[in-house]
């Protein structure tokens, strides 16, 4: 996130000094060291294209712009010793205020911006992990990919990452910089949420799969009974309208959901208000 609002905040933004991209991918390779796609054997972790990386960082607050670049794998991000960090932005931009966390679940294609306070950790290491052992069943990366043990994915159980905790990147903490950010802001931006009482209607969206019922974990997956097609417009809406989308997952595995070019606000999950 870089815009006029972000530029007024006291945040780390010196690229490569206190502001770092972290692109996370799990990959499989063939005998020629070429990527293998459409496989559950994605047991090699790459961070910014590097295996087992070490990132030199200053002993102050740093900013990590994290992207889950994996095809299927969900990461349950945290640091050793449950070191606290703060989420300040998501796919939708800056949050209204930092959120203190020890875990952050990140789905494929999802982004998050994090602040990590490394003050007082000079000459120490801090490792970022994915705590896969804590993922509930029904999420790709958990011990069991389907809810209630339904379905299977060829080669999934043999993957050494599934249901396990594993290191993503090591932060090697060095000297503080001359113009260090040393405090976490209490507020970020003012977010005006749309009024659901002024919506033009409710749109029903059902995620399902073809064949084998809910036990089919490999797809093809459907939205309202249809597979994706570049030649078809599934929905149309008036510019500037506010709609309520009611999304139901009728498969045995979790699916990330986002909309390109638009933002949305979650009102409730499973009838629990958010």
Please annotate each region the language model reported.
Residues 73-80, 127-128, 254-259:
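Short, hydrophobic/aromatic beta-strand segments
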Residues 119-135:
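Short, surface-exposed ligand- or partner-binding patches at beta-edge/loop junctions that are enriched
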Residues 64, 114, 128, 245-247, ...:
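A generic structural signal for residues embedded in beta-strands
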Residues 1-115, 134-136, 145-214:
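Histidine-centered copper-binding motifs that mark active-site loops
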Residues 86-102, 148-150, 163, 198-274:
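Active-site pocket scaffolds in enzymes
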């Amino acid at each position: 996130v870089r815009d006029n609002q972000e530029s007024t905040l006291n945040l780390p933004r010196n690229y490569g000094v206190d502001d770092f991209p972290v692109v996370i991918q799990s990959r499989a390779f063939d005998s020629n060291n070429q990527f293998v796609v459409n496989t559950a054997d994605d047991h090699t972790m790459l961070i910014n294209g590097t295996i087992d990386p070490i990132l030199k960082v200053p002993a102050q607050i740093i900013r990590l712009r994290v992207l889950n670049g994996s095809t299927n794998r969900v990461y349950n991000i945290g640091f050793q010793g449950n070191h606290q960090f703060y989420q300040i932005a998501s796919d939708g931009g800056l949050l209204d205020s930092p959120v203190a966390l020890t875990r952050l679940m990140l789905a494929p294609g999802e982004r998050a911006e994090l602040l990590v306070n490394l003050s007082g950790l000079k000459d120490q290491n801090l490792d970022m992990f994915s705590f896969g052992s804590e993922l509930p069943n029904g999420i790709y990366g958990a011990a069991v990919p389907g809810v209630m043990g339904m379905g299977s994915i060829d080669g999934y159980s043999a993957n050494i990452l599934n249901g396990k905790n594993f290191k993503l990147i090591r932060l090697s903490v060095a000297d503080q910089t001359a113009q260090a950010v040393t405090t976490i802001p209490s507020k970020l931006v003012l977010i005006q949420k749309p009024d659901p009482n002024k919506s033009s209607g409710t749109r029903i969206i059902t995620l399902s799969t073809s064949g084998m019922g809910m036990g089919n974990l490999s797809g093809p997956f459907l939205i309202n009974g249809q597979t994706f097609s570049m030649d078809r417009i599934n929905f149309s809406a008036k510019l500037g309208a506010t709609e309520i989308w009611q999304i139901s997952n009728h498969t045995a595995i979790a699916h990330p959901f986002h909309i390109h070019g638009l933002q949305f606000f979650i009102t409730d999950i499973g009838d629990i208000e958010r």
